[in-house]
Amino acid sequence: MASSSPCQIFLVFVMVTLVTSLIPSNALLTPHFYDNVCPQALPTIKSVVLHAILREKRIGASLLRLHFHDCFVNGCDGSVLLDDTPNFTGEKTALPNINSIRGFSVVDEIKAAVDKVCKGPVVSCADILATAARDSVAILGGPQFFYNVLLGRRDARTASKAAANANLPSPTFNFSQLISNFKSQGLNVKDLVALSGGHTIGFARCTTFRNRIYNETNIDPIFAASLRKTCPRNGGDNNLTPLDFTPTRVENTYYRDLLYKRGVLHSDQQLFKGQGSESDKLVQLYSKNTFAFASDFKTSLIKMGNIKPLTGRQGEIRLNCRRVR
């Protein structure tokens, strides 16, 4: 393949510089961030996400989880996407991430498509995650789950495996630990219960719920017996079970399951103990009112997406979401 001439390289540099200069440098996120610089950015992301979900419906949950795991580790900055190299340690091999987060190839696909229509690296990988999560929720849940994503994040040049290990909530957390974990991110009880509704889609590995189905009493015995068929006491760590009975639809079955002690994860069932707590009341509300769940879920997703974003001239806009420039 012929190499690029110095003139061509210079023209590309000038183009990228001009495009970058058009991007607002204020620190406020806004849904209109790309309206002028690249109006086709968001429709392009939605198109790629839609085709990815049509290929594999599970990918919607994976993209939502990526956004969550990104934001809870030093803010929504795309750090979760960075690969390990001989001189750089990313977050992908942190205990809460390994064998859990996936969908990186779809993010690569989105990045390539967006850079093509924008004629350069205009949209950050962090904004791609936030938008892909929204599109996944809206595609799998319908119009009531659509919301305007706030945009303008930039990408981190660093990552922290230690922070990922420390900051991401464990499926074995009790209620107090969950509250403390979310509070450290500026999120409250309503955010905890609403965002946990992300488990209305997706699957869990046997290793994350084995102890619950064999050793806990706060679980429907028939439900526990059904889970034991796919999750033996020994072996089968990577066997999957849906987090609720409709793992490819965003709706409120997850909350109804909690009322009957059918939460797959220990941390899920901690949200409802039938003692009249604030979280109990929210679970009861969402279990019978999908619109209330949708409204609070969207509000909390927007709030989560505002956790310590890099803006203005902080960080960078990556050429490749898997590595820094």
From Swiss-Prot:
Its main location: secreted. Its EC number is 1.11.1.7. InterPro entries: Haem_peroxidase (IPR002016), Haem_peroxidase_sf (IPR010255), Peroxidase_pln (IPR000823), Peroxidases_AS (IPR019794), Peroxidases_heam-ligand_BS (IPR019793), Secretory_peroxidase (IPR033905). It is found in: Secreted. SUPFAM superfamilies: Heme-dependent peroxidases. Induction: Induced rapidly and transiently by the Sinorhizobium meliloti synthesized lipochitooligosaccharide signal molecule (Nod factor RmlV) in early steps of nodulation, during the preinfection period, prior to the colonization by S.meliloti and nodule morphogenesis. Triggered by reactive oxygen species (ROS) such as hydrogen peroxide H(2)O(2), possibly in response to S.meliloti in the nodulation zone of roots. Residues 1-21 form the signal peptide. Ca(2+) 2 binds at residues 200, 244, 246, 251. Expressed in the differentiating root epidermis following inoculation with the bacterial symbiont Sinorhizobium meliloti. Its cofactor is heme b; Ca(2+). The keyword Nucleus does not apply. It comes from the Eukaryota. Glycans are attached at residues 87, 174, 215. Substrate binds at residue 169. Binds 1 heme b (iron(II)-protoporphyrin IX) group per subunit. Binds 2 calcium ions per subunit. The active site is at residue 69. Keywords: Calcium, Disulfide bond, Glycoprotein, Heme, Hydrogen peroxide, Iron, Metal-binding, Nodulation, Oxidoreductase, Peroxidase, Secreted, Signal. GO terms for cellular component: extracellular region. Belongs to the peroxidase family. Classical plant (class III) peroxidase subfamily. PANTHER family: PEROXIDASE 72-RELATED, PEROXIDASE RIP1. This is Peroxidase RIP1.
